[in-house]
């Protein structure tokens, strides 16, 4: 096997991709707080792109809205496969991560507001900061520490974090964004409808188009247009990635040997793991702590910490357990409630959506600095605690697998 093939194969491993993501985040944090921080800010704020299309964006924005959309496409695509062929095909199992996501959105916001009332209402506008889960970082931590965890737990996390993030983005778009371009939003919806029809349509016309035009030439430009329209409408452009992933066809047709869904994942996963996610982490995780002198005494610091570290755990676990007891929904037999507790702690990782929400809601630079510092501290704490819990559960599942293997050979 050639060196490029070995690298590509390695990048299809979640553990390798997760390690690259975490490593890039550490480099960004050190760089942003080093004597060379000015070079980091200069790189992150450098703008490029076609101004005529209103896409003359900073490197940071291209990474957060553009490259991250590729990762969200892969997540949506993987969820589509699970909905059609796998774990989420059973509504009783799909209901639990969705209930966890709804609890993981609502409870952190309520906890934030409760702490805000206790501090006299200061920084109440930041209630949306703890609502979202940093899915890229959460999946990375799970991949690195949970190599022996059951596969359904990863599906649970993907479903939870995707619904969580999309719910948070939509809530913030309605509550905190006044400049939504509904024309661009409508055109994006039309583009998504065309994308879905070309993927899943069964008529002669669409079959002829798919036969005559190479898939990459048909869908890549269309996806770029949909992404640009979603970006122009003022809603987080990564939503376009998730929706297009969910619209992918998961069954081959005609002479196809593999479905478009599996073919797209085969091509894009190494790019996402090796380029998109590390660059996103490098451009997004560099939170400067300069000027955070009042960090410890700031109300928003404790509000964010409480929302992410307490609200997420209570919301995710509190959304899952009652649902399983009061309805026909149930966990996969391979999972235990200790696994879900680890995922609930992992949900306290912010970053992906929390940082943009902090920028939208902060009323001063001091508030923004404190909010970013709190997101960083909460995310690091959640990642370390989840690593301990899930690492222990991974060893537990490894022992169970060994015992089962020994029993099978005797």
From Swiss-Prot:
GO molecular-function annotation terms?
sodium:proton antiporter activity
Listed A to Z, the keywords are: Antiport, Cell membrane, Ion transport, Membrane, Sodium, Sodium transport, Transmembrane, Transmembrane helix, Transport
Where does this one sit in the cell? Cell membrane
Membrane-spanning intervals of the chain: 16-36, 55-75, 95-115, 125-145, 156-176, 178-198, 215-235, 275-295, 299-319, 340-360, 371-391
Q: What Pfam families does this protein's entry cite?
A: Na_H_antiport_1 (PF06965)
Task: Decide whether keyword Repeat is in the record.
Answer: no
Signal sequence region: none
- Give the GO biological process terms: regulation of pH
- Mind naming one GO cellular-component term on file for this protein? plasma membrane
Q: List the disulfide bonds.
A: none
Q: Which reaction does it catalyse?
A: Na(+)(in) + 2 H(+)(out) = Na(+)(out) + 2 H(+)(in)
Q: How does it sit in the membrane?
A: Multi-pass membrane protein
**Similarity comment: family membership:** Belongs to the NhaA Na(+)/H(+) (TC 2.A.33) antiporter family.
Q: Any idea what job this protein has?
A: Na(+)/H(+) antiporter that extrudes sodium in exchange for external protons.
- The name this protein carries in UniProt is Na(+)/H(+) antiporter NhaA 1/4
* Species lineage: Bacteria, Bacillati, Actinomycetota, Actinomycetes, Kitasatosporales
